[in-house]
A protein has these predicted regions:
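Conserved beta-strand positions
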Residues: 13, 49, 90-93, 139, ...
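Active-site mouth loops of central-metabolism enzymes
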Residues: 58-73, 107-116
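Single conserved hydrophobic/aromatic residue that forms the stacking wall/gate
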Residues: 1-12
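Short, acidic/polar
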Residues: 9, 67-82, 118, 122-123, ...
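Structural motif corresponding to the early beta-alpha repeats
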Residues: 39-66, 94-97
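Acidic (Asp/Glu)-rich catalytic clusters
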Residues: 33-46, 81-84, 129, 151-160
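Glycine-rich, proline-tolerant flexible connector loops at the mouths of alpha/beta enzymes
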Residues: 13-35, 97-105, 109
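Beta/alpha (TIM)-barrel catalytic core signal, keyed to glycine-rich beta->alpha loops juxtaposed to Asp/Glu
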Residues: 96-247
C-alpha cells in the first residue's frame, strides 16, 4: 500500500519505532510482517500491537473478543502469525473489558454487563510474557481507575506491571491531563499518545466543510468524537494561530 510504504520509509529515515498496530487492523499487521521478512529489519524496531476488547462490531474476532486467558493466547498467536515474528515487544489491551467511558465519552454512567476480572487478565498476560511471546504489556483507552487497578493487582500479586498507556492526546483532546498524567508520572507508565492531530482536524484539510476523498472522516463516518461545534471552533482558532505565524 503506497501510504504504508511512505510510513516505512519515514521510519527507516528517522529511526522511529514501528507505529503500534492492532488485532482489529489485521491486514496492516500482515503488511508489516511481510516488510520485516523482506528487509530483515525486525530486530531494529520496537514492535507493538493490541488485543481487541468486547464490542459487537468485532464479533468475528475469536467469537466475540474478551480478555480471558484462552482468548488472549489466541489473539497473541494470531498477531505473531500475521507479523511473521516470534515475539511482540509491547502487547496492549485495546480498550477495557468492562463498561466505562472511553472513545470520546465524557461522563461515567455505571452499567452492569459481563466483564473479565482484571486479575484474570493479568495472570493470562503473565503466562504469555513467561512464554517469551511478549516482552512488555500496556493498556489503551484506559481510565485512571482501571490503570491503578492493574498496577495495584500487579504489585500485590507479583504480576507483570503495565509499562505504557496509549490514550488520545492533542490540542483538541486534553482529557489525559485530568488524573491520567499524574498516574503516568508517579507510577512510571509512559504515554503513547494517539490521534495527536485530532483525526486530521488540526491539519486544516477539513476547513470550510471540506471532506477530501479517502480522508478518515469520509471513510469512517461513524467516528464522531471530534464532531462537536466547539471542537471545530477550537480547531479553526488553532489553525488561524498557525497561519498568523507562518507554520
Amino acid at each position: 500500500h503506497p501510504t504504508l510504504r511512505r510510513q516505512r520509509q519515514m521510519c527507516i529515515r528517522d529511526r522511529y519505532p514501528v507505529p503500534p498496530r492492532a488485532e482489529t487492523q489485521g491486514r496492516t499487521e500482515e503488511y508489516i510482517g511481510t516488510w520485516f521478512k523482506k528487509t530483515g529489519l525486525r530486530d531494529s524496531y520496537v514492535l507493538a500491537t493490541k488485543a481487541a476488547g468486547p464490542n459487537p462490531e468485532f464479533h468475528y474476532l475469536r467469537g466475540g473478543p474478551r480478555f480471558t486467558k484462552e482468548q488472549l493466547v489466541e489473539a497473541v498467536n494470531g498477531s505473531l502469525r500475521r507479523l511473521q515474528t516470534d515475539c511482540i515487544d509491547l502487547y496492549q489491551l485495546h480498550w477495557p473489558d468492562r463498561y466505562t467511558n472511553f472513545f470520546g465519552q465524557r461522563g461515567y454512567f455505571h452499567r452492569e454487563q459481563p466483564e473479565t476480572p482484571i486479575e484474570e487478565t493479568l495472570r493470562a498476560l503473565e503466562d504469555i510474557v513467561q512464554s517469551g511471546k511478549v516482552r512488555a504489556i500496556g493498556l489503551s483507552n484506559e481510565t485512571p481507575w482501571g490503570t491503578m487497578k492493574f498496577l495495584e493487582l500487579a504489585d500485590r500479586e507479583g504480576l507483570p506491571r503495565v509499562d505504557s498507556i496509549q490514550n488520545p492526546y492533542s490540542l483538541l483532546n486534553r482529557t489525559y491531563e485530568i488524573a491520567m498524567a499524574e498516574v503516568s508520572h508517579r507510577e512510571d507508565v509512559g504515554l503513547l499518545a494517539y490521534s495527536p492531530l485530532g483525526m486530521g482536524l488540526l491539519t486544516g484539510k477539513y476547513r470550510n466543510g471540506a471532506k477530501p476523498e479517502g480522508s478518515r472522516m469520509v471513510v469512517f463516518e461513524r467516528f464522531t468524537r471530534y464532531e462537536g461545534a466547539e471542537t471545530w471552533e477550537a480547531a479553526e482558532r488553532y489553525l488561524q494561530l498557525a497561519d498568523d505565524h507562518g507554520i
